[in-house]
Amino acid sequence: RREAQHNEMNTMFAKKALLGAAAALTVLTLAGCSTPDSHEPADLQDFREMVSPKVSWTASVGESDGYLTPAVTENAVYAAGGSSLYRLDRHTGDKVWEAEAGSRIVAGVGTDGMHQAVVTDRGEVEVYDAEGKFIWRATLSAETDVPPLVGQGLVVVKTSDTRITAFDIVTGERRWHYQGQAPALTLQAFNQMAWSPAGILAGQANGRLLALGLNGKPVFDAVIGQAAGITEVERLIDVVGRPWVDNQLMCAAAFQGNLVCMSSTNGQLVWNAKVDSVTGPVA
């Protein structure tokens, strides 16, 4: 019996010794992996404040877990939160009306000043008139967090399956759709469409800026960023943010790509710069 206990104790000591040696070897290995040349955090650089905004008013419009964006017109601010759509007075922030959507709003608001469009978590686009009265809804082909583009007699929606669909602003009838292509991996980033003299501008996940006419036909397809690298992450080149447009120029930016400015009528290159953007251009 004593001999058995003695052997058991020896076995325990041997196991502890092996564990201790393994731990010591791990520490030595980690120490060998460290380097005295490790990068220290960079010093913060001074910057000059270009704009000093002042709060004119605030208003509560409920909660949001998506990319809900207010739409501003000459006299109104249209905003969404929860399952509600609001019209607020632009100058005072006072609520003019509140409309209840069919379910939680996940994308919006799009407006032309007379019609307001949002997308709900049921995968439906809903349109309301200037008084907040519901007009129509239509089922989409996929989910989206991109605000609808409203105007020119159309409500245009871009969905996650790279489809762009246009509906009649009055009846909700589908006018046309355009099917794009996307790489295997795309960036989850804020994105919006815009009107331009060339038509509807829509940034694509393949690093291109697409312009569609009011009939849904491509006007041009401009390269903003080109994929480079080996991994899918290194090759992310989504066009991000909202294209900036005036009568002469339109500019767009791509993640890990370029800032490109083109003629707003034909898409011909004016200038570009190597800029890695996650928000898009603002002027």
Regions from the PLM with identified roles:
Residues 7-21:
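Bacterial N-terminal signal peptides that target proteins for export
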Residues 29-32:
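C-terminal motif of bacterial Sec signal peptides marking the signal peptidase cleavage site
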Residues 37-42, 47-71, 98-112, 135-151, ...:
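Extracytoplasmic beta-rich repeat domains
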Residues 76-79, 116-118, 155-157, 165, ...:
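Conserved beta-propeller blade signature
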Residues 80-82, 120-121, 159-160, 204-205, ...:
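Structural signature of WD-repeat beta-propellers
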Residues 80-91:
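Beta-propeller domains
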Residues 89-92, 129-133, 168-172, 213-217, ...:
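Short loop/turn segments that connect beta-strands within beta-propeller blades
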